[in-house]
Amino acid sequence: LSAAFTFLFAGCNPSTQPSDIVNSYDLSLSYDKNSHTLSGGMRFYFVNECEEEISFLLFNLHANAYREGASYPAVAKEYSSSAYPNGKSYGNISITSVKTDDSALNYEICGEDENLLKVHLSAPLEQGNNVTVEIMYSVKLANVRHRLGYTNRSVNLGNFYPILCYMENNAFCEYPYYNLGDPFVSECANYNVTLICPESYHVAHSGSKISEQKNQDGTTTYKFKADTVRDFALALSENYKVLSGTADNTTINYYYFADSKAESTLELICRALITYNELFGNYPYTDYCVAETDFCYGGMEYPQLVFISSGLVREQYVSTVLHETAHQWWYGIVGNNQISSAWMDEGLSEYSVMLFYKKNPDYGDFDTKLK
């Protein structure tokens, strides 16, 4: 773990100097529960830190993996029946405009599977210079128990917006949406997010909630802020109950449907965060949300937010909470390429779970868990 600790302080940490984390996303979102559509606008601020000028920006369009006819569909065949209990359903992302400084920019949908948005800049961007690009888009959600989709009681908004492709050796990396494992890799950035949704929804979120304003039309406007994180996600439900607690300097919010042991789950989340703080260094964020949701896998990690499947039995639920919480360090704070080096964050997260059991024997015998 010594190498990992070395990288810990060079990863996503809000105490990092602002000049080290330069890109930012301002997202304005509106969710229509009748059409299951998320309308969005994004202002993306980018500084060229490459050693040479660049003439375009490249963004991942992960939402297009849910469209009909996708060559790299989001859901693997072996999970299809679990993900689509009501039959196949499709979604996609549509780009409606791209501009900068009120001037339209040329763009194209490209990649192996219409999974990339290429934005051509009006002039080459030299090293150290910056540009702000505005992208308007609309996401149609599929009826699917997955990272991005809706069911009769939850709306999962993971990997929904255009996100800048990871850069390596002064070039953008292009990856399709592999449906086994986590097909994502991104640098840290700052996020300011505004969401308008029906007031009946409770919203689990990345970042911190800055404000909540009820509107006369029956909607609520939420504002969130997340600094130096690798992504931003949300989970919405009209059925959520919420329990809150604290772990060291972090506020914990647990969103659940019908967990008969909800108080124990909240205590588990707090204990996990405290244990990992002691083992790996303090969690650098003030808020952490755990959201039970309809999901065909065990769980999914996002910065300051994790999804936990509603279909797990208790023992699986506990181990998944521990595993996904460990991902806050391994992938979140300590970054790695989750596509080419999945063994790293997954291996360290599972190892962290074993360390938790060793330090907290009241949650299970370490030797038994190790077997």
Cite the ranges covered by each PLM segment.
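Beta-strand-rich interaction surfaces with strong enrichment in secreted/lumenal proteins
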Residues: 27-29, 106, 120-125, 179-183, ...
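Short strand-edge motifs at loop-to-beta-strand transitions and within beta-strands
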Residues: 115-119, 131, 220
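Zinc-dependent metallopeptidase catalytic helix centered on the HExxH motif
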Residues: 306-368
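Asparagine-centered strand-capping/turn motif at beta-strand->loop junctions
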Residues: 46-50
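Hydrophobic helix-coil surface modules that form long, contiguous segments used
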Residues: 182-322, 351
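Extended, low-hydrophobicity, Ser/Thr/Pro/Gly-biased non-transmembrane segments
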Residues: 43, 82-91, 96, 133-235
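N-terminal, polar/Ser/Thr-rich
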Residues: 3-7, 11-39
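Solvent-exposed beta-hairpin/edge-strand motifs
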Residues: 56-103
